[in-house]
């Protein structure tokens, strides 16, 4: 996949989520569709960070929340195209922990939240052998330009 197309509305939603959950990591899903080697965002679904300890540096999404996101996507003929999480007071680059727990095929959007304010975000894809992340291009598009069929 060479890029992810995001609407400003979705960017605003995941940025606000990162700010609301600060100083803990937030997490969530983006539902959308694929067209060729690009993905198109349609909806942001926030998820609860269920990690019991060290939530400032780690997140955990309950398996039932994953299933709910998949079910929601399936019901609308969409896909889970991205998993989003924040890095409180750290850069928007994947950590070794992120790499060790990621799966190929998803975009991973990381939001850098500094002192309670979302300051940047980047999207990453895990390479096929799971050794490193490749940064994806992000294109901001208008909602009305998305054709999911």
Question: Where are these predicted regions, by residue range?
Answer:
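Conserved, mostly hydrophobic/aromatic
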Residues: 83
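Residue-level "edge-of-site" marker
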Residues: 86
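Conserved beta-strand-loop surface patch within small alpha/beta domains used
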Residues: 1-80, 89-149
């Amino acid at each position: 996949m060479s890029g992810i197309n995001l609407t400003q509305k979705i960017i605003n939603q995941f940025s606000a989520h990162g700010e609301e959950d600060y100083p803990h990591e937030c997490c969530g899903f983006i539902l959308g569709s694929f067209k060729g080697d690009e993905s198109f965002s349609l909806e942001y679904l926030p998820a609860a960070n269920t990690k019991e300890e060290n939530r400032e540096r780690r997140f955990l999404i309950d398996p039932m929340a994953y299933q709910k996101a998949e079910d929601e996507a399936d019901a609308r003929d969409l896909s889970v195209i991205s998993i989003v999480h924040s890095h409180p007071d750290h850069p928007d680059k994947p950590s070794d922990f992120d790499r060790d727990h990621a799966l190929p095929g998803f975009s991973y959007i990381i939001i850098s939240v500094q002192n309670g304010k979302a300051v940047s975000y980047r999207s990453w894809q895990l390479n096929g052998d799971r050794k490193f992340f490749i940064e994806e291009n992000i294109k901001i598009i208008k909602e009305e330009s998305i054709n999911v069929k």
